[in-house]
Every structure is written in C-alpha cells, then in structure tokens.
Swiss-Prot record:
Entry keyword Cell division: no
Organism ancestry: Bacteria, Pseudomonadati, Pseudomonadota, Betaproteobacteria, Burkholderiales
Gene: rplE
Protein name: Large ribosomal subunit protein uL5
Keyword Heme listed: no
Classification via InterPro entries: Ribosomal_uL5, Ribosomal_uL5_bac-type, Ribosomal_uL5_C, Ribosomal_uL5_CS, Ribosomal_uL5_dom_sf, Ribosomal_uL5_N
UniProt-listed GO biological process terms: translation
SUBUNIT field: Part of the 50S ribosomal subunit; part of the 5S rRNA/L5/L18/L25 subcomplex. Contacts the 5S rRNA and the P site tRNA. Forms a bridge to the 30S subunit in the 70S ribosome.
Its job: This is one of the proteins that bind and probably mediate the attachment of the 5S RNA into the large ribosomal subunit, where it forms part of the central protuberance. In the 70S ribosome it contacts protein S13 of the 30S subunit (bridge B1b), connecting the 2 subunits; this bridge is implicated in subunit movement. Contacts the P site tRNA; the 5S rRNA and some of its associated proteins might help stabilize positioning of ribosome-bound tRNAs.
Keywords on record: Ribonucleoprotein, Ribosomal protein, RNA-binding, rRNA-binding, tRNA-binding
Family annotation (NCBIfam families): PRK00010.1 (NF000585)
Organism: Cupriavidus necator (strain ATCC 17699 / DSM 428 / KCTC 22496 / NCIMB 10442 / H16 / Stanier 337) (Ralstonia eutropha)
Gene Ontology annotations for the cellular component aspect, listed alphabetically: ribonucleoprotein complex; ribosome
Assigned protein family: Belongs to the universal ribosomal protein uL5 family.
Length: 180
C-alpha cells in the first residue's frame, strides 16, 4: 500500500503543477527525491551516551537507523580529533519519505511553539529546501519524559525542481505552511 501523500502527489499535485507551469510530459513535473535528517552533536566529544540517545531519537523520528557521522579532520579549537563521532544523519526515500513528510506537515509542525508557518526563503537556488527544527519533541514519537536533552535537527528536502519557484509550488501543493 502506497503512502497517503504518494497517492496525493500522483492524483492531485502532478495535474496542478502541469497546469501551473505548462509541462509537456509527466516526467518534467518536479518531485521530492529524498529527505535528509541531520543532527549535529558537537557536545558528544565529552560523552558517548549523547550519540546513542540522538541515534535513538532519530530512529524513532525517521523509522530507520541513522548513520553516525564522524569528523573529517581534527580541529584543536573544538577539541575534535579526526574520526570522532560528531553527529547522526538519516536519508529517507520512497514510501518512508512520504510517510515522514505527511507526519511532519500534519502533526509535527503544528506542535511547534509560536508557529506561524515555515520560511519561504530557505530554498538553495536549485530547488532544494532546508528547515531547522529547534527541539525534537515536536515529533509525536518522542516522549518528553524519556529524553536527556532538547536537540535540534536539520531537515533537507531534495527535489528535482529546476528552480526555487517550482520547488515552492511543489511543497505548497503538499500543504506546506509557508508564511511568505
């Protein structure tokens, strides 16, 4: 069974974007290729348990096990040696990606404190969108009592859109709450 947003994309988003931008082929219509969740954990150099807890949180949020990212080179000012674990990331594609996007837009974003919509300026010029989340407790899978610290994460949405205008129209069609 395909994810709800996957069906929604095929049945409603594609025709809407074809009409809006005048694409000649269905394959021209921009689509979301992947969503990457990244958690930078600079404070993990002192305590290895921080990485384990962050990996656990990301696993619950994404539904798949993240990869622990390691330092590419040593930085004496930050007391980091090469190969030290300094973060965790997970890449979602296909059905899991659509399920995450559905939960993110319909459940997690409305739970953000003082939420007035996401910025419409966080596109990179090539049709990809980045959003920072200040605390992981906005996701319903995370239980507030069981976390050791509030951690933020970066969510990158990679699309096949050629420019920011197409990408914004694509995410807008997925009911993304843009404020501007």
């Amino acid at each position: 069974m395909a994810a709800r947003l996957q069906e929604f994309y095929k049945e409603q988003v594609v025709p809407k974007l074809i009409e809006q931008f005048g694409y000649k082929s269905v394959m021209e219509v921009p689509r979301i290729t992947k969503i990457t969740l990244n958690m930078g954990l600079g404070e993990a150099i002192n305590d290895k348990k921080i990485i384990e807890n962050a990996v656990g949180d990301l696993t619950k949020i994404a539904g798949q096990k993240p990869v622990v990212t390691k330092a590419k080179k040593a930085i004496a000012g930050f007391k980091i040696r090469q190969g030290y674990p300094i973060g965790a990331m997970v890449t979602l594609r296909g059905e899991r990606m659509f399920e995450f996007l559905d939960r993110f837009v319909t459940v997690a974003l409305p739970r953000v404190r003082d939420f007035r919509g996401v910025s419409g300026r966080s596109f990179d010029g090539r049709g990809n969108y980045n959003i920072g989340v200040k605390e992981q407790i906005i996701f319903p899978e995370i239980e507030y009592d069981k976390i050791d610290a509030l951690r933020g994460l970066n969510i990158s949405i990679t699309t096949t859109a050629k420019n920011d205008e197409e990408a914004k129209a694509l995410l807008g069609a997925f009911k993304f709450p843009f404020r501007n």
